[in-house]
């Protein structure tokens, strides 16, 4: 039995067949307020359902593929994981659930790279669907795990199978992570979590350089506190200020992965190079944020 197969078996045994949280979370989400952005209507429930999909969606690999330059998609249908390839080893962004790590490893290998060449592991925010698998990735590859300082306490509370969550480097807003000539900048875009991290980098394709933004979730809690309200106001302002040619996110639906991948397979211009869509997700989430605030104010909440 190969090492990846053994690890897959072990993960299933440790985690068991329990249902993914998406169904319970979606059922607990309100179907109001409703906002309409670019002709489409959204509610808190529909946004979460769009992001998480079904339990099967969360674990089924999406076809691994090149996005642009040295950036590749290696995640599932509804949970993004990105591979940044460099001559000195690779950077993985978002391990997702621990049970998905062997799947991500296989996607990396299908692209012709070695999962063992993962030197750095980054994440967008301290929720299990994005960073629960960090300890297993480190166990398999020895990668250095780096995270925004504000999210470290929540990350360390994640202990799948009793594993301690590794943190090799705590990052601050604006710090750079560099490997093999590629630099990613950690941008604090708090609100969804205290250390929600949007990553920016540059990619080359066809003799041109493009600005790539990998968004952390911009989704507001249904009853944001004054502190979270202040954080999200700063975050939306910041996100709108970032140079962007290619917008990615921690859930594929946030940047229309399926539609863009279908166009990519047809040939022609790279559909991921789409500056006009860079703020679409911010528009949706900011509209919902203000609608939630209006409801909260109407109900007499602080």
Predicted regions and their residues:
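Conserved beta-strand hairpin/beta-sheet module of binuclear metal-dependent hydrolase folds
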Residues: 57-111, 115, 198-219
């Amino acid at each position: 039995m190969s090492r990846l197969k053994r690890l897959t078996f072990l993960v299933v045994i440790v985690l068991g067949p329990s249902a993914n949280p998406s169904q319970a979370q979606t059922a607990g989400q309100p179907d109001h307020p409703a906002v309409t952005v670019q002709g489409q209507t959204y509610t808190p429930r529909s946004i979460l359902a769009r992001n998480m999909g079904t339990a099967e969606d969360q674990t089924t690999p999406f076809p691994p593929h090149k996005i642009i330059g040295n950036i590749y998609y290696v995640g599932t249908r509804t949970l993004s994981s990105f591979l940044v390839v460099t001559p000195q080893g690779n950077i993985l962004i978002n391990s997702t659930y621990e049970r998905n790590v062997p799947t991500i490893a296989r996607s990396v290998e299908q692209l012709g790279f070695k999962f063992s060449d993962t030197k750095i592991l980054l994440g967008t925010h301290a929720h299990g669907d994005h960073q629960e698998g960090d300890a297993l990735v480190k166990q398999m590859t020895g990668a250095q795990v780096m995270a925004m300082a504000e999210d470290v306490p929540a990350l360390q509370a994640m202990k799948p199978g009793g594993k301690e969550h590794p943190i090799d480097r705590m990052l601050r807003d604006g710090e750079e992570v560099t490997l093999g000539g590629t630099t990613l900048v950690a941008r604090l875009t708090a609100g969804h979590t205290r250390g929600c991290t949007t990553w920016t980098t540059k990619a080359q394709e066809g003799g041109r350089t493009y600005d790539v933004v990998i968004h952390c979730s911009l989704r507001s809690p249904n009853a944001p506190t004054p502190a979270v309200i202040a954080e999200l106001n700063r975050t939306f302002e910041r996100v709108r200020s970032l140079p962007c040619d290619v917008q990615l996110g921690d859930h594929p639906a946030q940047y229309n992965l399926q539609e863009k991948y279908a166009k990519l397979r047809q040939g022609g211009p790279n559909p991921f190079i789409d500056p006009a869509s860079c703020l679409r997700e911010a528009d949706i989430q900011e509209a919902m944020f203000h609608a939630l605030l209006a409801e909260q104010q109407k109900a007499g909440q602080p």
